[in-house]
Amino acid sequence: MDIKRFGNRQGKTIMLLHGNLMCWRQFENLIPLLEKKFCVYAVSFDSFDGTAETTYTTAQAQADKLAEYIEKELDGRLDLLYAESLGCGPTIFLKASPNIQIGRMILSGPEYLDFGVLNRLILKVMPQKQYRTAHEKYMPAWALRFMGQTEQGMQTMLRRI
């Protein structure tokens, strides 16, 4: 995991968590707009940190690493946590952590996904699947693997939301 700090150290703290197949550079056009007023932390998760030495295992593992960093470097407090797609999993676990205080959270879904001619079909099917997942608190094994999540981790997350 790699965490870059930018901006005003006296300002409110903002942490940015990237989406899948991205790294902290996903926010490189946003950071200059924020850094004069805020202290900005841009994160690259394991497997996305450019070292080829780490592996993204679960959202919980990433949240644990972030919690350790936030406790040590920021006294356990963030003013704002922004998460894009993949970053939303660790964000939920951070919010549930008793040692981390987060003033505000913004969770942004996979808005950049475009399935072309399949968009209409996916929009007819996916909302029902998402409702079923939230209602039954069940996620298929293939989806858990795709998200880098375990059944236990998903059940914990679903109980807390």
Question: Where on the chain are the PLM-derived regions?
Answer:
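Active-site loop/oxyanion-hole signature of alpha/beta-hydrolase fold enzymes
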Residues: 41-80
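Structural signature of beta-strand start/N-cap positions in the alpha/beta core
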Residues: 13, 39, 78-80, 102-104
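Conserved HGGG/HGGXW glycine-rich cap/lid loop of the alpha/beta-hydrolase fold
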Residues: 6-52
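Gly/Ala-rich beta-loop-alpha elbow adjacent to hydrolase catalytic centers
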Residues: 82-91
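Active-site signature of alpha/beta-hydrolase-fold catalytic machinery across serine-
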Residues: 29, 93-97
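Membrane-interface segments of envelope glycosyltransferases acting on lipid-linked substrates or membrane lipids
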Residues: 20, 44, 64, 110-119, ...
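Flexible "cap/lid" loop of the alpha/beta hydrolase fold
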Residues: 96, 102-133
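Conserved alpha/beta-hydrolase catalytic His-Asp/Glu region
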Residues: 117, 131-161
